[in-house]
Amino acid sequence: MNKENLKKLCLQSIDAHKEDIIALGEDIFRHPELGFKERRTSQIFSDTLEELGIPCRKGIARTGVKGRLAGAVPGPNVMLMGELDAVVSPLHPCADLETGAAHACGHNSQIAAVLGAAMGLAPLKGLLGGDVTFAAVPAEEYVELEFRQSLQEKGEIEFMGGKQEFVRLGVLEDVDMGLMIHSHAGVTERRFLLDCFSSGFIGKVIRFTGKEAHAGSRPFDGINALNAAALSLLAIGTQRETFREADRIRIHPIITKGGDLVNIVPADVRMETYVRGMSMEAILSASEKVNRCLKGSAYSIGAGVEIDELPGYMPLHQDKTLSRLFAENGERLLGPDTGIWGEELLGSTDAGDLSALMPFIHVSTGGYAGDAHAKNFTICDKEMAYVMPAKAMALTVIDLLYDKGETARSIRKNFVPRFTRESYLAFWDKFRRGETCGDGF
């Protein structure tokens, strides 16, 4: 069967399942689950794949799923990936009343689109020049850190992000390249946003330690850890002129505990911060400056400081050839000039980690109103949110795996990874460290 007929058969199958795809997306939207807890959504994903005759591996990194559709011959393995988790947005009208979880980032659309693509590609089993992997990953949103640290302590996970766990567990060793889509809040029209950039980040959990004393009668006997924290915020702010504009450094700390009682000099003060940037080199440089500010501020007050570094996510660098293929199929579906290219999205995603290991794209899609992670986030065009991405991904897979997968082979051959799996894990393992400055009290 020629490529055009394969594409027509695929689109016919997706159109036949259009209402099912939308219903899946809407059902997941109404039942949001937070990272590493996405039991219901994971079950929906695996059940749907198995109904299509696609065998699944379940329980990866607690809730992840990996299904595989075999090709006609051994060849490249192309992955379509979706994220299972919701974000914490308790004011959203569809938020879970107990957890505050809401699909205010549109990950429900990803799962529906991957399953929709599977519905289009399943009838092509044995007709493609390689395999298709359908993956559902947990925990893209970097939230509930205490819960995730408890999982680390129990040995259930090592990384905070689901894709990082997939890498650690070796689940992606047989995958040659990956595609996924993501909502773009505020883009209501039918557009695909291609080859966009996202920053990487690292996290810090900080504890300033001082000495308690009565804040009214004998404050001079104490050492005020809150003063050390406040001074560190000022010191970090004065670093801004040292950051290059091209590096897009963002540092945004918060104080999570300012003391215990108002009439006691604070002796235990907690902070958290991210350090973001467009390259790991820039992030690590800025991180060292932040650490100097933290340690210097503690020293000047006579306090102690503990700094725990948390592996974050790497910057996203999308494969340009994959992006062009997706764009061609997007224009087939939406019309000419419907692609938006090269926007800077200064949030972060663990898709960046995968882009350092394999050819990968993370296409943003229109069909959404409101703001990301906010109570006004909503899907205003359900066909654009759920069905069009399914079609675009499936058509791109056909392009990649037609003719014994020659296009996919070429993309993989020309890709230069920033890390191997081993060096990637070694990088983050070396980074995971803590620092202590001062004696504390």
Where are these regions (language model features)?
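Metal-dependent amide/peptide-bond hydrolase catalytic core
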Residues: 227-441
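Beta-strand segments within the central parallel beta-sheet cores of soluble alpha/beta enzyme folds
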Residues: 23, 62, 80, 129-138, ...
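Histidine/acidic-residue-rich, glycine-tolerant segments that coordinate divalent metal ions
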Residues: 92-102, 108-109, 121, 126-252, ...
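Electropositive phosphate-/nucleotide-binding environments in soluble metabolic enzymes
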Residues: 4, 8-11, 15-22, 39, ...
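Acidic/His- and Gly-rich active-site-bordering loop/insert found
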Residues: 3-104, 108-133, 138
